[in-house]
Amino acid sequence: MKRLVVCWLVAAACRSPAIPEANRFPAGTGFTARHVTVDGTTLRYIDSGRGTPVVFLHGLGASMYAWRKNLEPIARAGYRVIAFDNRGFGFSDKPATGYDNASYARLTVALLDSLHLPDAVLVGHSMGGAVAAEVAIAHPERVRGLVLIGSAGLGAREPRLFRVGRWPLLGPLLFAFRGRGLTERLLQATYADPRKVSDADVDQYYAPVAEPAYGRALRAVLREFRFDALAGRLDHIRAPTLVLWGEADRLVPITLGRTLAAGIPRAAFLSVPGAGHSVQEEAPDEVNRLLIRFLKDGLARVPGDLAFGHWADIFPQPSG
């Protein structure tokens, strides 16, 4: 164990300069980054398109860059897409506290209020899925539909790095040395095929990590956020729900995805072959196809008593 920690510290100490602000996502796209202050936190966000609003919530250690391959196709299909760097991540504020599940849910609702949205479809990945589900439980009237992608909420085996990060002495030291190489390895672990992670991807993920407040915020998340908070509460989710999983997810096992879907009254479970935890990044075409199908057909056609596994007419499997 000590040897592993030392290796992490040595790797993390290899710091690299972050990309310039002018090159940060969404630079080079048709989107524009905006800022809004809600619930005492200034959030960096994207808001584009018309139609039913779809709000994207990223996972632990990520930012709205995690949705770079999904936003434009969903907007082009006729939807209003909203993505944001959540509190403590990306280039949004990183206060000392406010990282528990209820606080993140309240922040999400405050963002909807600031955008004058009575409700929206929430799409959450990993930790963002747990936040989206928390909103659906605590504020059901604000959630028109729910998409949970490789979602946290039922507990999963944490990377050892995160467990060490909670240690009183080693935690601050570990997160003080956040190198680009460490970011690259963590990102590759979320893919079934690590070769699909590009240098540009690593640059974008590393840019906020290099900020001084990032380590403190990440430690606060690991202290305050419960990654098993949905256990025993899934039947409180009333929104029509699509649960998506990469079949090669090594961080949150696919068995948890099936359990998640089975516990939600109006849910369907679908898996994507050959994709890991970051399935929306690794297999974007398939994820976008399923998302659009859910938005076009699933929201309107799902009856309140629909049982798990009966969505074959909405989501036919591709032939061949």
Model-found features: residue ranges?
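Short beta-strand/loop motif that positions the catalytic acidic residue
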Residues: 237, 243-245
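Flexible "cap/lid" loop of the alpha/beta hydrolase fold
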Residues: 137, 146-175
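Short glycine-enriched nucleophile-adjacent loop
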Residues: 129-140, 146
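Acidic catalytic loop of the alpha/beta-hydrolase fold
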Residues: 248-252
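Conserved alpha/beta-hydrolase catalytic His-Asp/Glu region
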Residues: 162-163, 176-236
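Active-site loop/oxyanion-hole signature of alpha/beta-hydrolase fold enzymes
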Residues: 29, 38-39, 46-48, 76, ...
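Conserved HGGG/HGGXW glycine-rich cap/lid loop of the alpha/beta-hydrolase fold
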Residues: 46-91
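Catalytic active-site module of serine/aspartate enzymes centered on a nucleophile-bearing elbow/loop
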Residues: 267-268, 272-318
